[in-house]
UniProtKB/Swiss-Prot annotation:
It holds the Pfam family 7tm_1. This is C-X-C chemokine receptor type 2. Interacts with IL8. Interacts with GNAI2. GO terms for molecular function: C-C chemokine binding; C-C chemokine receptor activity; C-X-C chemokine receptor activity; G protein-coupled receptor activity; interleukin-8 binding; interleukin-8 receptor activity.
């Protein structure tokens, strides 16, 4: 997720005393630093054209899936639930990130040719998506916990509170992504492709370690603990209760946690190993460095895939989304109204009984 910025005439002073062989938040060492690195990389990147194809597929799937999610939620004004609002914001975050994927894909082949302004903008969108997406997932788990375990929506049903929570998530995400906006720019150097990267002056090493800790804590560990706590108690309640749709609810909840872990756990484990190596807790060798660099490239792709899987997890699994989409198609005369399910309702998140929602 990081790129590199520096003036070519400040190379030695800028990197004095820092290990040049390894820093990357989600990618390997920029090409123009390879000659200065103490370790000669065996293979620093996955085949770039393969990565471009993956980015293109994720872009198309995310664009289509998240657009449909937003369309169905916006059409469902009457029965829109709290979780619908969170899903709307989640789809928006993933959609904004998807719009940057063509630029990132092009940079994999040609280097960064888009200038400093786009360097800052697309990097900011990528960081904001990273933070806001996972924080919204945590909010959804809290909403499910309150609805099923405590059978209440007294707090979360207040519209002004839900809007405040969503605005707070966007604000916090922008705050956490602010260093990217401040420090990223484009660097041009002889004999290598231009790149988009951070430039933090003489304190680059210390700042980067701080920025490494932030995404691991706020972007993964804290939301994961919240999700495990909320969904753990939710599953226990569903096992004890006699709810008609509890098996469907359990499948959806398991899918939520499983996909989240599959997409983000490998990357964060590799990132943790990389952090321990930088702080000398784990001895660094060239072989270990090369393995971690390749692992960061591979596991980053899993994280990117999560943005196009969200519509499948939170919408397509639920029949209410399909009903809502069919209603939109019927309204515009694309299908017959006779094909609509009789129990089709505006909200696609799940079925409710009283104050308790039993599916995601």
């Amino acid at each position: 997720m990081e790129d590199f910025n520096m003036e070519s005439d400040s190379f030695e002073d800028f990197w004095k005393g820092e290990d040049l062989s390894n820093y990357s938040y989600s990618s390997t060492l920029p090409p123009f630093l390879l000659d200065a690195a103490p370790c000669e990389p065996e293979s620093l990147e996955i085949n770039k054209y393969f990565v471009v194809i993956i980015y293109a597929l994720v872009f198309l799937l995310s664009l289509l899936g998240n657009s449909l999610v937003m369309l169905v939620i916006l059409y469902s004004r009457v029965g829109r639930s709290v979780t619908d609002v969170y899903l709307l914001n989640l789809a928006l975050a993933d959609l904004l990130f998807a719009l940057t994927l063509p630029i990132w894909a092009a940079s994999k082949v040609n280097g960064w040719i888009f200038g400093t302004f786009l360097c800052k903008v697309v990097s900011l969108l990528k960081e904001v998506n990273f933070y806001s997406g996972i924080l919204l997932l945590a909010c959804i788990s809290v909403d499910r916990y309150l609805a099923i375990v405590h059978a209440t929506r007294t707090l979360t049903q207040k519209r002004y509170l839900v809007k405040f929570i969503c605005l707070s998530i966007w604000g916090l995400s922008l705050l956490l992504a602010l260093p990217v906006l401040l420090f990223r720019r484009t660097v041009y150097s002889s004999n290598v492709s231009p790149a988009c990267y951070e430039d933090m002056g003489n304190n680059t090493a210390n700042w980067r370690m701080l920025l490494r800790i932030l995404p691991q804590s706020f972007g993964f560990i804290v939301p994961l603990l919240i999700m495990l706590f909320c969904y753990g108690f939710t599953l226990r309640t569903l096992f004890k209760a006699h709810m008609g749709q509890k098996h469907r609810a359990m499948r959806v909840i398991f899918a939520v946690v499983l996909i989240f872990l599959l997409c983000w756990l490998p990357y964060n484990l590799v990132l943790l190993a990389d952090t321990l190596m930088r702080t000398q807790v784990i001895q660094e060798t060239c072989e270990r460095r090369n393995h971690i660099d390749r692992a960061l490239d591979a596991t980053e792709i899993l994280g990117i895939l999560h943005s196009c899987l969200n519509p499948l997890i939170y919408a397509f699994i639920g029949q209410k989304f399909r009903h809502g989409l069919l209603k939109i198609l019927a309204i515009h005369g694309l299908i017959s109204k006779d094909s609509l399910p009789k129990d089709s309702r505006p909200s696609f998140v799940g079925s409710s009984s009283g104050h308790t929602s039993t599916t995601l």
